[in-house]
Amino acid sequence: MRVPLSWLSEFVTLQVPLADLLERLPAAGIEVAEVECVGADWDREKILVGEITAVRQHPNADRLTLATVAYGGGRTIEVVTGAPNVTVGLAGVKVPLALSGARLVDAYAPEGGTIVLKPSKIRGVRSEGMVCSEKELGLSAEHEGILFLPEDAVPGTPLAELLGDTVLHVELTPNLAHCLSLAGLAREVAAMGCGELVARADALAEGGGDASAAVAVRIEDPDLCARYCAAIVEGVTIGPAPFVLRHRLRLAGIRPINNVVDVTNYVMWETGQPLHAFDLDRLRGEPGGAPAAIVVRRSRPGEAMSTLDGARRELAAGTLLICDGKGPVALAGVMGGLESEVTDATRRVLIEAAQFDRTSIRVTAIGQRLPSEASLRFGRGVPAAGCPGAARRAAELMRRHAGGTVARGLVDVYPRPQEARTVRLPADEVARVLGANIPEAEVRRILVSLGCTVAAAERGALAVGVPATRLDLAIPADLVEEIARITGYHRIPSAPMSGEFDPPCPDAALDAEDRACDALVACGLTEVITYSLTDPAWCLRLGLESDASGFVCLANPMTADRTHLRRHLLPGLLETLQHNLRHVGRVAIFELARVYIPGGEQLPEEPRRLGLLLSGPSSPPWWGEPEPPL
């Protein structure tokens, strides 16, 4: 996850230097893989904010124009450009201006190539500088047009002052799903003592019709969709989002699309709640119901749909879908459908904020090969409590940036509301698990800073009320882990293991395997370890099995070519041979491992087997000797 510090600062006021923050985050289990300083390599005297004052046609080229650019202090320069968005008559637009001597990314060179700008004649006209695209500045891969800056940008200002930022590339383990948002990460930073949370109060101006009269929402399987919220914004005008919003999305690694779609991504980055925007006028209703309908259900046999990427997708049985009154309009939590996408003609938008079952979303994303930021978050767990707030936040931002009005109310279907959870933390549990004595006052402070409530319980224990946003806190060990993280693992003293250890028990079978492996290695073979998962087609082609019924099948395979547990070692050895023959002519390998034989209703048998594979000359070739036999 990419975290621009300027954006994070809207949620937490940092009170420590960046170097200290970078030291504390890994100590709490939040790895920072890279620190990207955007604009640090922009020359502050040669890469500036410019204002286009006039554009005229190039006298010798139909596809080029001459732009007069002012850059403060009465200074102007004329540059040649072929950008399609710099047209004759354009004026008053702020753009990035690079003067002679500036170093830029070469938009037409391989990744990482740069150029130093020099005065040049282009089709007979001298150009002293360049107006820049996003790619030439290193902001993104977009280079079809010039980057237009905010209207209030001051000509002559170093571009680094306007667009410069520090972006943290944060790598999060699955247990830190609550940090997949700026709000969640900000709470962690504040809990560590590195900053203070910023109080945010987002008002929502409602003025349209009643949302419940425009759409009806029905959940067929509450086990797969615990909550579904729908907000409606009417009278929108589709266009580019404001510059600040687009720039932040670029820094976060998200390509801007339009003001409506960009708002859904923006709010997801802020809150961690994935959102989707439907064209409300393209959603069909159910007979006798509201004009539009949302039905959350499993797929039916033979169903298919076209997704936003233009692909026609066959749906596996049980795939969770978002449907209207006629059929599927989205793969729930993964990707929207073409039939309901937001287009330039969209005037009414339905904003979806829901909680979907994490396992179901992972199965769909893997099966359809559609990983996304939304499916990543749903797959790790999204709390139902955040749905209404995220939907309202997105509706308000769309009202501001796309016009229109927000319909009154929120359609909120929540069949089984989540009950408040309390975890009992015994008085000695922290010291028992961590081996460190952390004062109770500090334990209370840490838990409260993470959003928990803490009350005294019997026998010195603490009754910890878990916030609805933390799905991962369920048992005392979870709370102890949080206390250890926020304290800092580096502050917990290490102690060597002590006490008596039982002597190892002799294992005749294991000793025999070790002797066999040693003997094979002494004969020149190499031991390999291959996948326990396989494709039965290998065994069918080799004649080892007549059909696939004799294999243990995985209920949720990660890939299409690793769907069953192996019955034989030979397919894995042949795959290894296939790979190694690209590099060497002689392969001598063996594997000693388990195979899996179905046992009916019982667990499969797991006998250990030895497989050997020899290919090529019987010994390595040697200079001056005849070629060895195969």
Listing of model-derived features with the role each one plays in the protein:
Residues R2-L8, G164-T173, A226-E234, E373-G381, ...:
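Short, hydrophobic beta-strand segments
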Residues V189-E220, A402-V430, A436-N437, L479:
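Terminal amphipathic helices with adjacent charged low-complexity linkers/tails
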Residues G184, V423-F590, I597:
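Extended, well-folded interaction surfaces typified by the phenylalanyl-tRNA synthetase beta subunit core
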